[in-house]
């Protein structure tokens, strides 16, 4: 299985190139790039007010207001410090870099810029991981509508943090492949006792969402992660956040890859069957042609 990259490579490569050219004393060039990411996220890299010595990186998330309620602004201020500026119009967060005043740790700064989406997501996880560490219980469940028709729920208890993703399957084939995929996760946990518990429910929401307006339907699935202190403690939580916030994309990416592989194998098998049928086809019977006098035509 393939792990999706947590960072955004376009941001990192663009910024790294700008920093490298500035450090070499090259003349700055204009940049104007708009591109999308998973979960309807939109990025914009530009020169504010046409100033080529400044590079602005902005991100738009439809659900950012929900993240703000869980401390997203404070976390971003802690991570990005003075690089965080007022967001440009149409975006939720903007970072500004001055090519005439390069930071000392350029590689670290570039990497953190590439982690912008992840760091926006991280606030809700850090908040509930902290609740669990402090033994708090009864806090309101976090509800993040991270896609138009899909939702993430996070809830903490004294001994665990429960994260539930709702997801919509496009067709019946996706449901079947998704179930097989989730079964592999259950089998994997048997081999690793430190892995979190993973549960999958189809059509009906899990018991954790019994009193909510969680969606119900034949194309609805719910993936539940039960995270214990070994997954949420200070030394492990960064890696846990990296992996879990991309899980929905990870699941659907592999469903699409599986379908593509199956279709490729089907086409290959069909081609093999056609070759067998062509070899088995009898040769056309040659008819003997004669003239009215009884002579036989012969091909030259």
Swiss-Prot record:
One of its GO terms (cellular component) is nucleoplasm. Keywords: Acetylation, Actin-binding, Cell projection, Cytoplasm, Cytoskeleton, Nucleus, Synapse, Synaptosome. One of its GO terms (biological process) is positive regulation of lamellipodium assembly. GO terms for molecular function: actin binding; structural constituent of cytoskeleton. It is found in: Cytoplasm, Cytoskeleton; Cell projection; Synapse, Synaptosome; Nucleus. The modification N6-acetyllysine is found at residues 275, 295. The keyword Cytoplasm applies. InterPro entries: ARPC2 (IPR007188), ARPC2/4 (IPR034666). Its main location: cytoplasm. Actin-binding component of the Arp2/3 complex, a multiprotein complex that mediates actin polymerization upon stimulation by nucleation-promoting factor (NPF). The Arp2/3 complex mediates the formation of branched actin networks in the cytoplasm, providing the force for cell motility. Seems to contact the mother actin filament. In addition to its role in the cytoplasmic cytoskeleton, the Arp2/3 complex also promotes actin polymerization in the nucleus, thereby regulating gene transcription and repair of damaged DNA. Belongs to the ARPC2 family. Component of the Arp2/3 complex composed of ACTR2/ARP2, ACTR3/ARP3, ARPC1B/p41-ARC, ARPC2/p34-ARC, ARPC3/p21-ARC, ARPC4/p20-ARC and ARPC5/p16-ARC. Interacts with SHANK3; the interaction probably mediates the association of SHANK3 with the Arp2/3 complex. Interacts with DNAI3; this interaction reduces binding of the Arp2/3 complex to the VCA domain of nucleation promoting factors. This is Actin-related protein 2/3 complex subunit 2. The gene is ARPC2.
